[in-house]
Amino acid sequence: MKPFIEFKDFSFKYDAQAEPTLKEITLSIEKGEKVLIIGPSGSGKSTIGHCLNGIIPNIYKGQAEGSLTIDGKDVFDLSIYEKSHLVSTVLQDPDGQFIGLTVAEDLAFALENDCVAHETMFERVDTWADKLDLKELLQHRPQDLSGGQKQRVSLAGVMIDESPVLLFDEPLANLDPKSGQDTIDLIDHLHQTAETTTIIIEHRLEDVLYRPVDRVILINEGQVLFNGSPNDLLKTSLLQENGIREPLYVTVLRHLGLDIKNTSHLANLEQLDLSGVSFAGDISLKEPQEPQVLFDIQHLNFAYSSERPILKNLSFTLNKGERLAIVGKNGAGKSTLAKALCQFISYAGQIFYQGQDIASDSIKERSERIGYVLQNPNQMISQTMIFDEVALGLRLRGVDDSQIEKRVLKVLKTCGLYEFRKWPISALSFGQKKRVTIASILVLNPEVILLDEPTAGQDKKHYTEMMSFLNDLHALGHTIIMITHDMQLMLEYSDRALVISDGQILADQSPITLFNQPDILRIANLKQTSIFDLAQRLNCDPIALTHYYIDQQGGEDE
């Protein structure tokens, strides 16, 4: 029997590039399989998805060699309409997938295009709304829903077409930890009940392995480096060599001396034989320093309308030299809090800077106290050349040209961008663009740098580079605020966690202490790391084991 999806010596080169992105790939996927495709940024994994769903060659043009077939049909001979009946795609950003004004309209969109009879359309919308727990939301606007609800709507919108292949392009990228876990649960449930061929493109390996997959395919530099079971992959060094983060518990077990290469069931912590592993470490706490309050936020309130309060009487302090992680579920008010701190929105309440009420700050004045770096650097960049982008804020402030050059070159050196100072921004990677946006803020000398999801969508290599860079800035005396869904980032790179839930502060404590409070984690849609699960298996103190992990990672980074 022929494979349902088959790449044979398949290569693809974008018209805009000199070298092929995919290089003589030979790969097959059987009908009904559940496959995870992983790889670092720029590896070619997304290009595989684009070739399957028709984005290539219908939107992105290029030259293909070899063959790619789905159900025996040559993909490049099919129209985009024909491909849509073979492959349904759930995009990384659900907001980019919504068509209808209501959830019901959005679900019905594909059926309307297929001229399905009204009676059948209502039946199928009702069926899929029921399967994905959307019955109560059918008359709501998709844009008003939570991150997890949006994901279910976009899923229903493609599942309703009942295509045999379901393709997920980084489905976890914009979700809080619990919503991400629920999404993996949902994908697994749909795979089993709808009997689809399921392909997940992600780099968050541990999160996807929350539910079983049949195979993992590792791609880098346009080639298949591994094609086999998750257990076999975890026994190799391929993840570390190719910039993919392995499960946290596997990293800890390596440090504790477990013979990884000869261990079964590595992909499932519950099934691991840990009889030869133990941990008896204790906690050595650093002497806390007397905090120096930099910002004092008192009774902060904000609402888009009287019926829709977003921030509810928030009060907290930010200390000089701190690394503060702001966490919470999608829609909790984290980004709104950031906008209020930066004076982008009018709020009720008071913000004091070193004891001075700064309510009368202009946006310009506030930006010199708090520099805000957006999640997507492309939304901040407006100039063609790197030097000009970093210099823009100074030029707008009328700074003398000689001072501009001096300050820009200094900050480019700090950000590791000096050698690229004459480059066009278009030649940079995503991570480098992120550094450019940070440099454009740093050059204004703000006391605080506020970053929205600083590592979103980045593989382990770029994640580590970004966080090491932020650590260097912190060592230079900058106070860092990070809005994040990444529990490992919070654990390793912050001193304090502020948990926001429904516009209120649910907790304000050290990250490790937070992980030991399951009720707070549940309310805020956060989750414990697998280090805590491993500690339960080893019958040891999870906080001590977490400290051990952080100490080991610190040693590796030096």
Swiss-Prot record:
Organism: Streptococcus mutans serotype c (strain ATCC 700610 / UA159)
EC number(s) recorded for this UniProt protein: 7.-.-.-
Main localisation: membrane
Similarity comment text for this entry: Belongs to the ABC transporter superfamily.
Recorded name of the encoding gene: sdcBA
SMART domains: AAA
Record key words, sorted: ATP-binding, Cell membrane, Membrane, Nucleotide-binding, Repeat, Translocase, Transport
Subcellular location: Cell membrane
Record-linked SUPFAM superfamilies: P-loop containing nucleoside triphosphate hydrolases
InterPro entries: AAA+_ATPase (IPR003593), ABC_Co_transporter (IPR022216), ABC_transporter-like_ATP-bd (IPR003439), ABC_transporter-like_CS (IPR017871), ABC_transpr_CbiO/EcfA_su (IPR015856), ECF_ABC_transporter_ATP-bd (IPR050095), P-loop_NTPase (IPR027417)
Coiled coil start-end: none
Binding positions (ATP 2): 328-335
Single GO cellular component term: ATP-binding cassette (ABC) transporter complex
Enzyme class: translocase
Domain ABC transporter: 5-246, 295-527
Disulfide pairings: none
Role description: Probably part of an ABC transporter complex. Responsible for energy coupling to the transport system.
UniProt binding sites for ATP 1: 39-46
Name this protein carries in UniProt: Putative ABC transporter ATP-binding protein SMU_1934c
Membrane topology: Peripheral membrane protein
GO MF, one example: ATPase-coupled transmembrane transporter activity
